[in-house]
Amino acid sequence: MAHDMYPQPRPLLTPDLMIRAYAAGIFPMSEGADNPEVFWVDPQRRGVFPLNGFHISRTLRRQIRFGGYSVHINRDFAGVLDGCADREPTWINADLTACYLALHAQGLAHSVEIWDDEGLAGAVFGVTLGAAFFGESMFSRRTGGSKLALAHLIHRLRAGGFTLFDTQFVTDHLMSLGAFELPRSDYRAELSHALQLPADFMSLPEDVPLVV
């Protein structure tokens, strides 16, 4: 996928810089957990989830109806970061982790977590700004864990008045769930609109049931 990258030499990434970048349609990544450098990405085509078009498969529908899990919001945000970074390759380095933790402390970064009897089964996390949610990463430790987290996340975003769910890039997996690409100009128009609107990520209790 074509995208523009802007290397950032040290000094350090800051939470304020990250927020200003998100508002401009740019997001940071690194080359790996042990690589201290951060680069800025501005894709020519941007991945988004339609908040009314998330595809719930029969298997996922059965999982939701069967239950056997609980949903928590921000219960273990640091653990979610660790879970997302615990893969090869990873784009989350120490500076990014520190900034996400700081944004979480400011109420701007959130995790939707799926828990079962064995612990954290899967999760997704991202950053909120106005009525935009910037999805950063997700992981599963049990079958369907991240899909369950996504389903509950989208329900929460819709209830909270969000208008944009930015996935940054799209993969075949995300496309199978309904994600698609927007040209940069269209994405920026949607982002500009979303930034002017109020939204509330915490408008729902964390254990609200998902009816499918």
From Swiss-Prot:
Group of enzyme by EC: transferase
Main subcellular localisation: cytoplasm
Family membership: Belongs to the L/F-transferase family.
Function: Functions in the N-end rule pathway of protein degradation where it conjugates Leu, Phe and, less efficiently, Met from aminoacyl-tRNAs to the N-termini of proteins containing an N-terminal arginine or lysine.
Classification via SUPFAM superfamilies: Acyl-CoA N-acyltransferases (Nat)
Gene Ontology cellular component annotations, sorted alphabetically: cytoplasm
Protein name: Leucyl/phenylalanyl-tRNA--protein transferase
Superkingdom of the organism of origin: Bacteria
Enzyme Commission number(s): 2.3.2.6
Organism: Jannaschia sp. (strain CCS1)
Listed GO MF terms: leucyl-tRNA--protein transferase activity
